[in-house]
Amino acid sequence: MGEDAAQAEKFQHPGSDMRQEKPSSPSPMPSSTPSPSLNLGNTEEAIRDNSQVNAVTVLTLLDKLVNMLDAVQENQHKMEQRQISLEGSVKGIQNDLTKLSKYQASTSNTVSKLLEKSRKVSAHTRAVKERMDRQCAQVKRLENNHAQLLRRNHFKVLIFQEENEIPASVFVKQPVSGAVEGKEELPDENKSLEETLHTVDLSSDDDLPHDEEALEDSAEEKVEESRAEKIKRSSLKKVDSLKKAFSRQNIEKKMNKLGTKIVSVERREKIKKSLTSNHQKISSGKSSPFKVSPLTFGRKKVREGESHAENETKSEDLPSSEQMPNDQEEESFAEGHSEASLASALVEGEIAEEAAEKATSRGSNSGMDSNIDLTIVEDEEEESVALEQAQKVRYEGSYALTSEEAERSDGDPVQPAVLQVHQTS
């Protein structure tokens, strides 16, 4: 571009020189006419001058365009830089807006929570206000009552709690007379309560300024007297109920009930029948003073219901046939045994019961023969063994007699011997 500008300047300078030279040339000959050769040269020079002028103008225009394009490019670069800076600022603004939106969401959540809490607090405050209003009303009522009491300035509070008594119906059913007595005693208690309540004076100090102390003393004395009377009555009732519960008649009734539960009426009748029949048979078949229980090793099975009854029958038959003159010695021997000997005697009685069933099933003659055969004594050692067994059998008989007497006494509740029998057993 710089070279083009220099060439354009060169072309401009010779043209100006030629123009300066042209007017100087025709000045010497103004009156002469130009020749045709001169005219041709002038036209060519004019064409050349015009072409040079056009080239210079084009070059100048091109230079201007180049300068304008350079300026435009520079402006575009500046605009691009500005656009980049604007984009960065816009991105920052967008980030700030997103942050603001997040903060706005969090603030909206917190505000909603605060609103809920405020609603709850308002509800609680309303409830508290209602409670406070109620309490205020109650306090006002209490204040009014207190003011009334202060105006009266003379009041008493009586606290009474009746003691829990032992009901006699737990032990024994009381007759109608006991209920009548209780009805008669209740109005007395009510009367005493009414008397104590009437003694309380609720008058004011203005009405009775001088007689207050005397009235208080009399009321306290009456209250103490009524309490002492009630305590005495309750203690007497308890003692009476205990006496009635543990009276002789009640104990006998209970013992009779236990006897009926243990041994039924049917079993008693069976025992009596078996006692009468077996007693006659064994008394007729008595052979020697040394009696041994017959057939002690029996294997016959017996029903459970009749085992106890037959045990008593057998133990009753054997000593009845062998009543010895030394009854006092037998009683002392029976009382000297312990509870362990009682258990062994019961076991032997069961064995004897089984043997008795076998003996009764057989004929009376065969029973007598077997008893005679078993009671034959050959040596002195056998005699000593027989004596020991006879003593055991006698003890069993005494125990069976006591049990039979107890059962008979159960049938007759009036007899007082029931307690003595149980004590000895």
UniProtKB/Swiss-Prot annotation:
Modified residues (Phosphoserine): 27, 35, 37, 51, 203-204, 218, 283-284, 287-288, 293, 332, 341, 366, 370, 403
Predominant location: cytoplasm
Region spans: Disordered: 1-42, 199-234, 271-425
Modified residues (Phosphothreonine): 196, 199, 375
InterPro entries: Cavin_fam
Subcellular location: Cytoplasm, Cytosol; Membrane, Caveola
Comp. bias (Acidic residues): 203-219, 376-385
PTM description: Phosphorylated on Ser residues.
Region spans: Interaction with CAVIN1: 2-168
Residues carrying N-acetylglycine: 2
Keywords recorded for this protein, A-Z: Acetylation, Coiled coil, Cytoplasm, Lipid-binding, Membrane, Phosphoprotein
Biased composition (Basic and acidic residues): 10-22, 220-234, 303-317
GO CC entries: caveola; cytoplasm; cytosol; membrane raft; nucleoplasm; plasma membrane
Keyword Coiled coil recorded: yes
Bilayer-crossing regions: none
Annotated family: Belongs to the CAVIN family.
Subunit structure: Component of the CAVIN complex composed of CAVIN1, CAVIN2, CAVIN3 and CAVIN4. Binds to PRKCA in the presence of phosphatidylserine. Interacts with CAVIN4; this augments the transactivation of NPPA by CAVIN4. Interacts with CAVIN1. Interacts with CAV3.
Protein name as catalogued: Caveolae-associated protein 2
Lineage: Eukaryota, Metazoa, Chordata, Craniata, Vertebrata
Gene name linked to the record: CAVIN2
